[in-house]
From Swiss-Prot:
GO terms for biological process: signal transduction. GO terms for cellular component: plasma membrane. This is Rho GTPase-activating protein 5. Expressed in differentiating xylem cells. The record marks R88 as: Arginine finger. Signal peptide: none annotated. PANTHER family: MKIAA1688 PROTEIN, RHO GTPASE-ACTIVATING PROTEIN 5. SMART domains: PBD (SM00285), RhoGAP (SM00324).
Length: 331
């Protein structure tokens, strides 16, 4: 019986699709046939869902599309925060179309006008298939009156939309920090961003809703600015306290050093006094000995005087030795 070769063979390849890098995991012979970049406007970075875009984290932990981070970085690097009327003044249409084409190819050209960059950020939000605030019940948003109401209602957003809103709010807060230069306060920024955060078919309803969205954005932006200022003041107070503590510690160390020096000087003085007492004692002993010697000398001297006084004459021999007196006999 002849044994034939295997039949009905299948090769299964597990691959991952990435919008920016095509299929990952394909055999190398198939890679040249896979486009590496978005090939047409149908795969543009504008007007598509965030689920089909490459995401990354910003400095505050918001997971947002990379295109927004790139536009934001370029806007900041080119001094867009200081540009007067940023996000209010529109850029040149021809330049915006050119930049759009380059962004679809994954390229960010150099020398883009800051107003064009700001306009593209607004356009990205405006052209989303679903607005950032669309998941919220419009009736509930319209009923908000206080800052606490707005904070509560935005907590109902899904994670993706919440990250996008938080990113936009912090962007506006960054702009407000240079309000004295760019003339853009919280109201002006909320006014230009509000129409791009939701989509409604009825123009009149959309207009009324945009007014409430403007209040929401203004409230959240001002809250963020206040929190930053409070955090900054806390840091400043902490640094000031640390500086004061450092000065106090330094003063204490200097006082301790001065006290130690004084103690050392006192110890030296005491040592000198003790040393002086020792010298005095020694001199006193020497004086006692001298007095004793002198007394002995005086004593021996007085005896000698008496002895000498009792002799009639001093008689010396040839050797100069004192001779005893010669007693004369009585007649």
């Amino acid at each position: 019986m002849d044994i034939g070769g295997p039949t009905n063979i299948r090769h299964v390849a597990h691959v991952t699709f990435d919008r920016f890098d095509g299929f990952l995991g394909l055999p190398s012979e198939f890679e040249p046939d896979v486009p590496r970049k978005a090939p047409s406007a149908s795969a543009t970075v504008f007007g598509v869902s965030t689920e089909s875009m490459q995401l990354s984290y910003d400095s505050r932990g918001n997971c947002v599309p990379v295109i927004l981070l790139l536009l934001q970085s370029r806007l900041y690097d080119q001094g867009g925060l200081q540009a007067e009327g940023v996000f209010r003044i529109t850029g040149e249409n021809s330049e915006e179309e050119f930049v759009r084409e380059q962004l679809n190819k994954g390229i960010i050209p150099d020398g883009i006008d800051v107003h064009c960059l700001a306009g593209l950020i607004k356009a990205w939000f405006r052209e989303l298939p679903r607005g950032v605030l669309d998941p919220l019940p419009s009736e509930q948003v319209m009923q908000c009156e206080s800052d606490e109401d707005f904070v509560k209602v935005v907590r109902l957003l899904p994670q993706t939309e919440a990250s996008l809103l938080n990113w936009a709010i912090n962007l506006m807060a960054d702009v407000i920090q240079f309000e004295h230069v760019n003339k853009m306060n919280s109201r002006n920024l909320a006014l230009v961003f509000a129409p791009n955060m939701s989509q409604m078919a009825d123009p009149l309803t959309a207009l009324m809703y945009a007014v409430q969205v403007m209040k929401l954005l203004k409230s959240l932006t001002e809250k963020t600015v206040r929190e930053r200022e409070a955090s900054s003041s806390v840091v400043d107070r902490r640094c000031s306290k640390e500086a004061e503590d450092g000065e106090k510690e330094k003063d204490n160390e200097e006082e301790e050093e001065d006290e130690e020096e004084e103690e050392e000087e006192e110890d030296e003085d005491e040592d000198e006094e003790e040393e002086g007492d020792g010298v005095y004692i020694i001199k006193e002993e020497e004086a006692s000995e001298i007095i004793k010697v002198v007394a002995d000398e005086h004593k021996s001297g007085s005896i000698k005087s008496e002895f000498e006084g009792s002799s009639a004459t001093d008689s010396k021999g040839d050797n100069g030795v004192v001779q005893p007196p010669i007693c004369s006999s009585n007649p």
